[in-house]
Amino acid sequence: MIHIITGTLLGLLFLATGARAQFQFFEQMFGGGQQQQESQEHNVPSDSSWYQRTYDNARCSDYLCPGTLACVSVPHHCPCQHPGVEDKFELGDGSAICVSKGGFKPGEAARKVELARKGLL
């Protein structure tokens, strides 16, 4: 009789411990408690009014790049928004594009841009 009660109590103890571990896992995984409040301060809703105010208040006598708010002499001189992961290519028609480096070997992204411009890619 004692073995049955002991076995039952041990079983309940293991179930309770397992359930607590699962809840802790989900709380950790989905940012429960204090961490969630901290992350909410950083994840604010998108608000274009900040960008519009910054754009309107920028001082530039030539061309103000819309993506980076850099002041350049002509539009195709605008820098890429993420130069660490993008390469810029000036096209012959006075425009420019930024292309993800994407792990290509040096010069490979430029070659692919040229092939695409010729309709070969």
Swiss-Prot record:
GO terms for biological process: ERAD pathway. Probable component of the endoplasmic reticulum-associated degradation (ERAD) pathway. Keywords: Signal. It comes from the Eukaryota. CDD domains: LCL2-like. PANTHER family: LONG CHRONOLOGICAL LIFESPAN PROTEIN 2. It comes from Blastomyces gilchristii (strain SLH14081). The keyword Signal applies. This is Long chronological lifespan protein 2. Residues 1-21 form the signal peptide.
